[in-house]
Amino acid sequence: MEGKTGVLVKNTTSDVWTWDNPPEGFYKATAATCTQVLTFAVGQEQPVGFVATCMSVDPDGDVSVSLLTPHPDGALITQTSGTGKWEAYTGVEWIGGTDIQIDANTSTYSWKATD
């Protein structure tokens, strides 16, 4: 989507998330599908901002939905809803970012608690 002063790029990815020191009963890694919207100023290669909505289902079938926003250390992920073991983590935030960019639509990310 193009405007006079900028461009919006929408991208959907299939990723692997790893968790630093996950709580007991949680998996070290989960799969996530994210829809990202990146904002670029005209003529710039680096985005000026982004937001992403991510959906995840762990191996037990518990689900979560999270919102990713920019953070000085990479990205801030805030869980907006969850079921099963994830239900108690609604509103919790983690900080992390890309570890490996596998291709244009697949990456691995690692997350750690904000406190």
Question: Where are the regions that the model predicts?
Answer:
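Beta-strand-enriched cores of mature, soluble protein domains
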Residues: 1-115
